[in-house]
Amino acid sequence: MDNITSRPDPTAAFPNPNLPRLCFIKNVVKNPRIIIGDYTYYDDVDGADQFEKHVTHFYDFIGDKLIIGKFCAIAKGVEFVMNGANHRMDGVTAYPFYIMGGDWGSAIAPVKDELPLKGDTVVGNDVWIGQNVTVMPGVHIGDGAIIGANSVVASDIPPYAVAAGNPCRVIRKRFDDDFIDYLLAIKWWDWDIEKIEANFEALSSGDLSLIRKIKV
């Protein structure tokens, strides 16, 4: 596109004043362990700025992070379940007596190293996550992946896969392996915004030959 005179401000909470249901997540979250790339948005008619409430069981003493790349589209109701949701499972019961307080507060509480922690949850760049998806602790979703609505993502999803279901499984690849490798190499999401704007057609049309014509 030529002669662009206005573009969404990557530092704005709500980049389109006519679309208050959509926010750039990076500019509304407060927790420093939620790390979001530029232009990644959350779409929720009931309060897009409430994204952080959908990151659950996110406790400081565990220290895990939620990391989401650039240019991701996250639909209403997506929930990221973090490692604090996991109970110790090597005893007879997984019931956490100690959290009830009172005299039960002296029951054996697990230390961090005894919990089944899965590490940081990482979503790549250019990922589309459909409505009401649940992402479980420690999952890695690759660049360019698409996750179908109402899925429960409990294991890693490779780049440029279309995945859905409970548990979420890969349905198909979006492109052949050679083209996926090419896209992962050029990392279009890291281009400067002027270059992205100049190549909207190559990025968004169904003509995959156009992207290979761009000097990278």
Where are these regions (language model features)?
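Outer-envelope exported proteins of Gram-negative bacteria
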Residues: 39, 69-71, 144, 148-150
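Extended, small-residue-rich solenoid/repeat segments and analogous flexible loops
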Residues: 1-33, 97
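Flexible, glycine/small-residue-enriched loop-and-beta-strand segment within the central core
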Residues: 24, 34, 41-135
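Short clusters of hydrophobic/aromatic residues that line enzyme substrate/ligand-binding pockets
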Residues: 29, 92, 208-211
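C-terminal segments of enzyme domains that contribute to small-molecule binding surfaces
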Residues: 2-7, 13, 98, 105-135, ...
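Beta-rich strand-turn-strand
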Residues: 121, 132-145, 151-154
